[in-house]
A protein has these predicted regions:
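C-terminal catalytic domain of Rieske-type non-heme iron oxygenases
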Residues: 1-255
Length: 255
């Protein structure tokens, strides 16, 4: 937990959280493709009907695609966040770490099928369940959604050149009682569906790349900036790891 993240995590009191359920799926796709699929959100509208019952399309009011209604909703939510002393200012620690808090779809408070609380017992010191979702990106292998009632933690691990494990953990307050405060099937329903949809997308991308007919194309700076940031971070890490040998690679890349 980086020092810069501490104040963002404080309201959730992670020392008093527990894992309600955990799943791991195997994807027949390269680890890098799995991360790129997560960083690219243009596919969401056509691929994730369950997730879009609560998740808004944008996560930044400066996004040129963001509607005025979205900007107005964010502005309205900040007063509630301020009242509960919930941090929400965007924070980035280079390209590797990013934190952003955004509201969920108006009228919903959690990533469940009906948008209602997945756990009756709220996390940490939180009193208001309608705090949207705090999203934490940690390259190279983790993204997270933190809501008032539960958190969802994702980790991605390569196991071969074209196989990846994706583990998802749903965390609730340590005193929440299964069958009383939360139902495991309901808690995991949205992301079980979303993970399987993302698995299919990553595997289809892998099959396409394996084809002799494959040709890479450009990324959109508007719709795919998350992928571009990931690739910039990844490329820089690889070059740094090469040390002196990277000079030739940098020269070729810049030519």
């Amino acid at each position: 937990n980086r020092p810069g993240c501490d104040n963002y995590m404080e309201p959730y009191d992670m020392e008093n959280a527990k894992v309600a359920v955990q799943t791991t799926i195997r994807e027949a796709a390269n680890w890098k493709l799995v991360i790129e699929n997560n960083r690219e959100c243009y596919h969401c509208n056509g691929s994730h009907p369950e997730l879009l019952k609560t998740l808004l399309e944008w996560d930044d009011v400066t996004d040129p695609r963001a509607s005025q209604a979205f900007k107005d909703q964010v502005a309205a939510c900040t007063s509630a966040w301020d009242a509960e002393k919930i941090p929400y200012a965007h924070a980035s620690f280079g390209l590797r770490n990013r934190i952003v808090r955004m509201p969920l779809l108006d009228g919903t408070v959690s990533m469940t099928m009906d948008g209602k609380q997945g756990s009756k017992k709220l996390m940490g010191r939180i009193k208001n369940p309608d705090l949207g979702s705090m999203r934490i990106l940690h390259l190279p292998h983790s993204w997270n959604h933190c809501m008032g009632d539960h958190l969802i933690v994702f980790t991605v691990w390569p196991i071969s050149a074209q196989e990846t494990l994706v583990t998802t953990k749903w965390l609730v307050h340590k005193d929440a009682v299964e069958g009383v405060d939360y139902d495991v099937a309901r808690l995991r329903e949205v992301w079980d569906a979303t993970n399987d949809q993302d698995r299919r997308l990553a595997e289809e991308n892998q099959r396409g790349i394996n084809s002799d007919a494959y040709q890479p194309g450009p990324y959109s700076k508007t719709y795919e900036f998350g992928v571009i940031n990931f690739l910039d971070w990844y490329s820089e890490r690889m070059l740094n790891n090469l040390g002196e040998e990277s000079a030739h690679v940098r020269k070729v890349a810049g030519s």
